[in-house]
Amino acid sequence: MQVILLDKVVHLGNIGDQVNVKSGFARNFLIPQGKAVMATKANIEYFEARRAELEAKAAEVLAAAQARAAKLAELGSVTIASKAGDEGRLFGSITTRDVADAVTAAGVEVAKSEVRLSTGPIRTLGDHEVKFQLHGEVFATINVIVVAE
């Protein structure tokens, strides 16, 4: 199925590219999320008329993500208190939601879907490096310090 990309899609293409994808991927992911439209003659003409507007919008979103990444770098680290046993193991774990809530409380708005815990949930006390993917190509890293309550 031929589609026109309205946004940059990782491993697929940039704004305005006409790509051939499986119909299920187009119908269930790209089109509902507004990342692509079917490549009909009318849509091609419509897209060419709006190309500059869509590229400006994409640049604006990228600039906003870079500004948030700079704020995260400025923040540096976040402390999360959790109940823990004597050996330094937590009762429960620190998940992406907990990290996102702590960073948001510290003053930088992030969603839990933007948090990347490389080794899964945090289960021990101490310093842990957490990555954030704020945009397709904008990443930030902060240090999460887990302390016992």
Curated annotation (Swiss-Prot):
GO terms for cellular component: ribonucleoprotein complex; ribosome. GO terms for molecular function: rRNA binding; structural constituent of ribosome. GO terms for biological process: translation. InterPro entries: Ribosomal_bL9 (IPR000244), Ribosomal_bL9/RNase_H1_N (IPR009027), Ribosomal_bL9_bac/chp (IPR020594), Ribosomal_bL9_C (IPR020069), Ribosomal_bL9_C_sf (IPR036791), Ribosomal_bL9_N (IPR020070), Ribosomal_bL9_N_sf (IPR036935). Keywords: Ribonucleoprotein, Ribosomal protein, RNA-binding, rRNA-binding. HAMAP family: Ribosomal_bL9. NCBIfam families: L9 (TIGR00158). This is Large ribosomal subunit protein bL9. It comes from Pasteurella multocida (strain Pm70).
